[in-house]
Amino acid sequence: MTFTVVGRCPKTKMLGVAMATHAPAVGNSCPVVIPRMAAASVQSIADPRLTLLCTKLMGLGYHAGKIIEELETSDPNAPLRQIGVVDAWGNAAAMTGSENGAYAGHILGDGWL
């Protein structure tokens, strides 16, 4: 089980990701932060190719919803994934695949998930 917070400070505009999980070394494969662009987590049977694509889309300035859409449509295993993104404008978007555990989901707020 993994708990993740992705957010943007409304005052400083800084972005960040925090994770708590049983899996070792997720910090090497799940979170992505590009300062002044976006922050994200690509998790639940993480695929490094998705993390790289997420990084590319963030760098191109895609908004959070479009990043989620692109990642979900490019991944044949999307039902196994959980992805969350907060962009530089404070937009939050997420998807939780249908094949995640019984206790899986996401909550979106203004500049956080």
Where are these regions (language model features)?
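N-terminal nucleophile
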Residues: 1-113
